[in-house]
C-alpha cells in the first residue's frame, strides 16, 4: 500500500519534495515530512512508517492539514505546526473554518493535483494572469519559456506587435512589427506596409522617407493663385499715358517737382479744379497746357500757383499737415515746408552762411542780410550763389524761381527799393 502510494505520488508530480520523500522511503531513513510533523514533540522518536503518517494526516484533517499531507495519493502543502487541541473547544477551532476529512471516494479532478505538468498548472495557479493584462504577452512568454499559449480567446493587446521571442531582431517579416530604421538587406522596405493586427485607419509608426505616390499628385488646395505674388502697377492709365507720349504736355507741365496727389493710384498729377478740367478735356486742351495754372479748390481762397508743388505746400497750410519734423535732441518741432525746417535747424547749429561784403557781418537768413544792407544805403549783393536761397514764409528751398503768374507785391510800402537788391521779395506769397 505504501509503495503504491509513493509510486502514485512520483507518477503525478515531479516536485522536488515529492521526489525527496520517495528517495527517503526507499533508503529507509527518516522522512522530512515526518520530521516537520513532529516539531512540537521534542525528544520523542519513532521509526518511520508510511501508514502512521497517513493515519496522522487523517486525524488532523479536521483542524488543519499537516505541512505535507497525503489525500488520495496527493500531496498538499500546509503552513504552520499543529497546535494542542486541548486548549480549544470543539466549537471554536483554531482557524475560522475547518476542513472535514474525506469521508468517501472523491473525484481526483476536484483536488489540485501536485504532479501535473507545468503547462497545465500555470493557468490555474496564476489565475490573475489569465485575465487581459497590458503586459501579459511579455511576461507570459518568459514564464512559459517556449510553451505555446492557450486558445486565442484573449484579445491581443494593440502594442503586441512582436509575437515572436526576439522582438528587437531585424529578421522578422515586413508586415510584422515596426520597420527597422536601417535596412538590413539590399531590398528596400515597401512604402506603406499594412500591419495585420491593425485596422486600416492606422498608419505605420515610422513614416516612409519619401511620400506616397498619391501625395505627390498636385492638389488644388495647396496651389496658391499666382496673381497674389504679382507686383501691383505703380501708376494708373492716365499716368502711363502722360509719361508714354499720349499726353506729353502733362508730364512736361509738372516737371521734376511732381504734382499734388500724383503718387496716389487712380489720380492725376494734380487735384486742383483747373487740372481736373484739363484732364477731362484731354487732347482738346493741349493749347491750354502750355501755361498751366494750379488754383486752390478751397472755397473762399482762390489762390493760383504756377507749380503744383507750390499748390501742394499751400494746401498743407489749409489742412494743418506738418510732415517736416526737427530731429534735434529734445526739439521735435514740425513744419509745413522744408525751408522752414532748414531755417529752424540753423537756430540749433548757429550757422550763419550769409555774409555782408561791406562789414563782414554774418546772418542766418538772406532776408536778414538784405535788411542789414539797407542800413549801408547800398543795395546788397544778395546771397552767395553757392548756398540755397532763403525765401519768406511762402517759398521752399527748391522753389527759388519766381512764379509765372503775376502777383502783386507783398510789401507795397517799399517801392523805392532797387531792383537788384532782393528780387525775390517782390514775389513773396502770403500763405
Swiss-Prot record:
It is found in: Nucleus. Residues 403-412 have a biased composition (Polar residues). Keywords: Activator, DNA-binding, Isopeptide bond, Metal-binding, Nucleus, Osteogenesis imperfecta, Repeat, Transcription, Transcription regulation, Ubl conjugation, Zinc, Zinc-finger. Residues 30-56, 71-115, 154-260, 367-431 are annotated as: Disordered. CDD domains: SP7_N (cd22542). The keyword Transcription applies. GO terms for cellular component: chromatin; cytoplasm; nucleus. A zinc finger (C2H2-type) spans 294-318, 324-348, 354-376. Restricted to bone-derived cell. Residues 166-178 have a biased composition (Gly residues). A motif (9aaTAD) lies at residues 156-164. The modification N6-propionyllysine is found at residues 41, 45, 361, 371. SMART domains: ZnF_C2H2. PROSITE patterns: ZINC_FINGER_C2H2_1, ZINC_FINGER_C2H2_2. Ubiquitination at leads to proteasomal degradation. SP7 is a short-live protein with an endogenous half-life of approximately 12 hours. Propionylated. Depropionylation at Lys-371 by SIRT7 activates transcription factor activity and positively regulates bone formation by osteoblasts. It is linked to Osteogenesis imperfecta 12: A form of osteogenesis imperfecta, a disorder of bone formation characterized by low bone mass, bone fragility and susceptibility to fractures after minimal trauma. Disease severity ranges from very mild forms without fractures to intrauterine fractures and perinatal lethality. Extraskeletal manifestations, which affect a variable number of patients, are dentinogenesis imperfecta, hearing loss, and blue sclerae. Belongs to the Sp1 C2H2-type zinc-finger protein family. The 9aaTAD motif is a transactivation domain present in a large number of yeast and animal transcription factors. Interacts with RIOX1; the interaction is direct and inhibits transcription activator activity. This is Transcription factor Sp7. The gene is SP7.
Amino acid at each position: 500500500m505504501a509503495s503504491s502510494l509513493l509510486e502514485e505520488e512520483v507518477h503525478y508530480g515531479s516536485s522536488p519534495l515529492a521526489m525527496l520523500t520517495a528517495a527517503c522511503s526507499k533508503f529507509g531513513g527518516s522522512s522530512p515530512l515526518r520530521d516537520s510533523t513532529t516539531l512540537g514533540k521534542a525528544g520523542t522518536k519513532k521509526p518511520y512508517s508510511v501508514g502512521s503518517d497517513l493515519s496522522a494526516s487523517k486525524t488532523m484533517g479536521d483542524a488543519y492539514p499537516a505541512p505535507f499531507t497525503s489525500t488520495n495519493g496527493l500531496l498538499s502543502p500546509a503552513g504552520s505546526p499543529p497546535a494542542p487541541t486541548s486548549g480549544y473547544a470543539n466549537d471554536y477551532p483554531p482557524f475560522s473554518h475547518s476542513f472535514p476529512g474525506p469521508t468517501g471516494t472523491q473525484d481526483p479532478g476536484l483536488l489540485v493535483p501536485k504532479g501535473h505538468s507545468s503547462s497545465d498548472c500555470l493557468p490555474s495557479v496564476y489565475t490573475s494572469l489569465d485575465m487581459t493584462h497590458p503586459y501579459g504577452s511579455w511576461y507570459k512568454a518568459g514564464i512559459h519559456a517556449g510553451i505555446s499559449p492557450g486558445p486565442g480567446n484573449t484579445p491581443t493587446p494593440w502594442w503586441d506587435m512582436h509575437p515572436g521571442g526576439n522582438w528587437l531582431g531585424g529578421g522578422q517579416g515586413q508586415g510584422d512589427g515596426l520597420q527597422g530604421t536601417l535596412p538590413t538587406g539590399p531590398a528596400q522596405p515597401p512604402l506603406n506596409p499594412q500591419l495585420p493586427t491593425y485596422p486600416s485607419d492606422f498608419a505605420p509608426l515610422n513614416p516612409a522617407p519619401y511620400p506616397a505616390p498619391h501625395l505627390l499628385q498636385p492638389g488644388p488646395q495647396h496651389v496658391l493663385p499666382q496673381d497674389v505674388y504679382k507686383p501691383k502697377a505703380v501708376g494708373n492709365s492716365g499716368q502711363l499715358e502722360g509719361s508714354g507720349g499720349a499726353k506729353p504736355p502733362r508730364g512736361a507741365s509738372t516737371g521734376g517737382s511732381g504734382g499734388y496727389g500724383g503718387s496716389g493710384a487712380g489720380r492725376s498729377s494734380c487735384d486742383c479744379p483747373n487740372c481736373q478740367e484739363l484732364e477731362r478735356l484731354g487732347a482738346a486742351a493741349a493749347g491750354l497746357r502750355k501755361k498751366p495754372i494750379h488754383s486752390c479748390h478751397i472755397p473762399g481762397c482762390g489762390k493760383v500757383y504756377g507749380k503744383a508743388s507750390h499748390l501742394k505746400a499751400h494746401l498743407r497750410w489749409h489742412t494743418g499737415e506738418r510732415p517736416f519734423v526737427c530731429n534735434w535732441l529734445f526739439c521735435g518741432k514740425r513744419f509745413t515746408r522744408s525751408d522752414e525746417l532748414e531755417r529752424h535747424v540753423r537756430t540749433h547749429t548757429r550757422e550763419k552762411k550769409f555774409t555782408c561784403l561791406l562789414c563782414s557781418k554774418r546772418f542766418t537768413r538772406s532776408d536778414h542780410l538784405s535788411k542789414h544792407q539797407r542800413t549801408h544805403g547800398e543795395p546788397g549783393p544778395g546771397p552767395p550763389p553757392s548756398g540755397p536761397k532763403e525765401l519768406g514764409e511762402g517759398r521752399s528751398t527748391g522753389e527759388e524761381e519766381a512764379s509765372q503768374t503775376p502777383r502783386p507785391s507783398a510789401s507795397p510800402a517799399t517801392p523805392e527799393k532797387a531792383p537788384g537788391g532782393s528780387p525775390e521779395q517782390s514775389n513773396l506769397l502770403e500763405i
